[in-house]
Amino acid sequence: MLLPKRVKWRRVQRGRLKGKSKGGNSVAFGEYGLQALEAAWITSRQIEAARIAMTRYIKRGGKVWIKIFPDKPITAKPAETRMGSGKGSPEYWVAVVKPGRIMFELAGVPEDTAKEAMRLAMHKLPIKCKFVKREEVGGEANES
């Protein structure tokens, strides 16, 4: 599972999930991508489950890139504990994902194989996603 080697602060505030993704919203490394359509916290276990689902389907062909990293610690207090007495200890790590973010990329496989691999990965994630293809260089210039 993914988690940071070291962090500056052990506990962080929860924050809010508003707005669209500022960066990472285009397919950069592979040919195909999995784009988030909703905002959510994606846990390191969910990322790993999606990665395993994709790599098992494409077998030895192709390459998978994970474009999100769980760098936010989520704390929890033990069960049946009274309120107060400080913030709980870090339990797991999440990646903050906003709409438009490309979470996974895939290359080196046919489009139908990539679509099915991404579909299997979508079932492991708690948000709606869509399959996207890499834009041609000319297509990106016309958008601006």
From Swiss-Prot:
Family matches, as InterPro entries: Ribosomal_uL16, Ribosomal_uL16_bact-type, Ribosomal_uL16_CS, Ribosomal_uL16_dom, Ribosomal_uL16_sf
GO molecular function: rRNA binding; structural constituent of ribosome; tRNA binding
GO BP annotations listed: translation
GO cellular component, one term: cytosolic large ribosomal subunit
CDD domains recorded: Ribosomal_L16_L10e
Alphabetically ordered keywords of this record: Ribonucleoprotein, Ribosomal protein, RNA-binding, rRNA-binding, tRNA-binding
Keyword tRNA-binding carried by entry: yes
Keyword Zinc tagged: no
NCBIfam families recorded: rplP_bact
Task of the protein: Binds 23S rRNA and is also seen to make contacts with the A and possibly P site tRNAs.
Assembly description: Part of the 50S ribosomal subunit.
Sequence similarity: Belongs to the universal ribosomal protein uL16 family.
Name this polypeptide is given: Large ribosomal subunit protein uL16
